[in-house]
Amino acid sequence: MKRLAILITVISFATVVNSQSIPKMKMADVVNSFSNGSDTMYVVNFWATFCKPCVGEIPGFIDIVKKYKAQKVKLLLVSLDLPDYYPAKIAAFVKKSHFNTNIAWLNETNADIFCPMIDKKWSGAIPATIIVNGKTGYKKFFENEMTSEQFEKEVKLALAK
């Protein structure tokens, strides 16, 4: 319970990465962050510093989530970078890229176990994104790069349901 309270605190308040320590998370913690039945809509994006499509879509995600902040939309970027990248290389990359949002590093190595926790069809490829609106029951998983236009369309759908 204490762990969940800490996790919710991390997710609830946008942590500015410029001086942030990036928390380690288990996939169960990630799932719990959006399974709490709250009236907040969560966008969880799985990415890595070495994944060009991942890095390319993140600025648009950040801008769109800011646009819908009043509707309680929150973004969590979950890095799937290798352990050698944690935390220094990830933090430096995030700072250089101006990714001012919630960031965590997935402290898991077995994709056969953690991928189905998000979606049974997830092969482990990135970028991958799940959008969950606890208030409406909307839940949709994407295993591909999304344009800003596609992403905003999905955010609008999730808010309207």
Task: Briefly describe each language-model feature range.
Residues M1-M27, A160:
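Bacterial Sec-dependent N-terminal signal peptides
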Residues F93-I126:
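Short, internal strand/loop/helix patches
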Residues I126-K161:
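Thiol-/selenol-based redox modules, centered on thioredoxin-like
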